[in-house]
Amino acid sequence: MKTVGELELSGKRVFIRVDFNVPLDKEFRVKDDLRIRAVLPTLNKVIEKGGKAILASHLGRPKGKPSAEFSLKPVGEHLSRLIDRPVPLAPDCTGREVVERIAQMKNGDVLLLENLRFHAEEEKNDEAFSRALADLADVYVNDAFAVSHRAHASVHGMTRFARECAAGYQLENEIKYFRKAMDNPARPMAMVIGGAKVSTKIGVLEHLISRVDFLVIGGAMANTFFKAQGKEVGRSLVEDDHLETAARLLKAAAEKGVKVYLPVDAVVAPSLESCGDVQQVPVEKVPKDRLILDVGSKSIEVFESVLKNCRTIVWNGPLGAFETPPFNKGTFALAEFLGSLDALTVIGGGDSAAAVKQANMEDKVSYVSTGGGAFLEMLEGITLPGVAALEECCGRS
C-alpha cells in the first residue's frame, strides 16, 4: 500500500479522509484533540509538498441533514490554531460552491469540507455521491483508521473513482503497530480486556484465545465471568444471557493453555454516586446490596506481576468505572504501569486511550490507537472495508 510521502503532490488536489469526530463541550470547543493531532503528520506532508489539502470528516450523527450542532466549524478553528494557518470551512462537502472554493486554492492551502453525514448518501455508500467526492480531487488519502470499518462513501465507495490513492501516516501506523502486536508478536504476549459487556467482545475473545499467552479480564465484563463461576456479584452489571458464553471461553482458554487472570478483589459501593461509602473486598465476599465498580489493589498487583514479564501487551477497555473517581484507580494504575514497561504496548482506542491520556502516559506507551470499533474488528480478525478498498485502489493507481 502506498503512503502519502511516496506521491508527487505539488499542485494536486489531495482529498484526505480524516476522523474529526471529536467530543465538544457545551460551548462547542474541542475537549479531546487526539484524533485531530493524529492527522498532522499527513497534513503537514501535503502542505510541505505543495499539495492542496481538502479535509473531509463526519461529526456525530446528524441523520443525513444539515445541523448547526454538528458543524465542523469549531474543529476547523481548533486545527487552525494547531497548524498556525487558516483552515476555512466550505459550505458543504459537494456541489458547485465547493468546486469553486477548491478551484481558488493555492499550493499549500487547506480547506475543510462540511460534515459528510449532512448527506444520507455518505453512510449509504451511494455511488453518485462517491463519484462526486472523487471528482473534487486528484489524489485520495485515507487517514481515518477509526472509521475504516465502515463501508461509507468517503471511506470505501470513492476509492473506485479516485485517480490515485494512498494511506496517510496515521492509518499506516495503526496497521503497522497492530500487525507487529498481533501477526508475529514478541512473546510472552498478553491481552488486557475490559469494559462493560462480554457480548460486545465475544468475537475478540474467541479470536485471541489461540494467539495470546495470558488473558487479563477486568471491567464490568468480569462480573459475568464471576457469576459463571458461581460467585456472588451483588447488584453489579451482569449479562445473564452470556453466562454460558463466559464459561465456554474460560474452558477454551484452559484447553489451549492460555492463563486467564480475573480480579481477586473489587472496589464496591451502593451506587456510582456513593463515593463516601466505598469498600475493597475479596471477590468471594461481594455484599449482595453492592455494585462492583473497580478492581482492587491486590488485583492490580496480580496483573502487574503477570504483565511485567511480557514483551507484547495489547489493552482494550477500562478496568472500572474510570470516569467517576474513586473508581478510576485501577484503570489509571494499569495505564501508569504499562507506561513504565520496556515492551511493545498497544492501547486500543476509546476509553482505554482516554485513560492513558488522563494518566499522562500517551508518550510512554508504544502506540495509542485512534480507533474504537475499527480496532475491535481488527482484533476479531476482520478485514476493514476501508483498508481493503484502499489497498485495491493503490494496486490500480
Curated annotation (Swiss-Prot):
InterPro entries to which the protein is assigned, alphabetical: Phosphoglycerate_kinase (IPR001576), Phosphoglycerate_kinase_CS (IPR015911), Phosphoglycerate_kinase_N (IPR015824), Phosphoglycerate_kinase_sf (IPR036043)
Pathway field: Carbohydrate degradation; glycolysis; pyruvate from D-glyceraldehyde 3-phosphate: step 2/5
One function term, GO molecular function aspect: phosphoglycerate kinase activity
Encoding gene, per UniProt annotation: pgk
Domain of life per record: Bacteria
Record-listed substrate binding positions: 19-21, 35, 58-61, 117, 150
Protein name (Swiss-Prot/TrEMBL): Phosphoglycerate kinase
Chief localisation class: cytoplasm
Subcellular location(s) of the protein: Cytoplasm
GO cellular component assignments: cytosol
Positions with a binding annotation for ATP: 201, 323, 349-352
Gene Ontology biological process terms in this record: gluconeogenesis; glycolytic process
Family, similarity comment: Belongs to the phosphoglycerate kinase family.
Pfam families linked: PGK (PF00162)
Keywords: ATP-binding, Cytoplasm, Glycolysis, Kinase, Nucleotide-binding, Transferase
Catalytic activities: (2R)-3-phosphoglycerate + ATP = (2R)-3-phospho-glyceroyl phosphate + ADP
Protein EC: 2.7.2.3
Keyword match Kinase: yes
